[in-house]
């Protein structure tokens, strides 16, 4: 499977390692300061990370502030809507403590 890992902290870096060990392809975005394992593709945009991905992986909690991706290891701030807009309808989304507003946006885009 191809996973797009967007935002998060050291837990997402560990998840990246585990997924790569299991033979999956991994693309990361908004994790510029994370120590990611070799084999992880670092992407310049959410759209690049999500292109052709099978599943979107988000952090826990998904958003630190209303509407913003929880991405303490990123060099900038990112709108959660930017991530959802780049995902294909029907794509599974995994994340923790998803706020009702974020869930509504994802469902409105046809994400599951």
PLM regions: where:
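Rossmann-like NAD(P)-binding element
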Residues: 45-76
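Structural motif
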Residues: 4, 57-59, 94
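Glycine-rich adenosine-cofactor-binding loop
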Residues: 3-14, 19, 112
């Amino acid at each position: 499977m191809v996973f797009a890992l967007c935002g998060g902290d050291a837990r997402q870096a560990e998840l990246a390692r585990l997924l790569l060990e299991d033979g999956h392809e991994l693309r990361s975005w908004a994790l510029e300061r994370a120590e990611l394992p070799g084999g992880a593709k670092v992407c310049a945009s959410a759209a690049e990370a999500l292109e052709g991905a099978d599943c979107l992986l988000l952090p826990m909690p998904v958003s630190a502030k209303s509407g913003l991706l929880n991405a303490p290891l990123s060099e900038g701030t990112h709108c959660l809507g930017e991530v959802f807009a780049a995902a294909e309808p029907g794509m599974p989304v995994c994340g923790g403590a998803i706020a009702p507003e974020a869930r509504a946006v994802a469902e409105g885009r046809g994400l599951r």
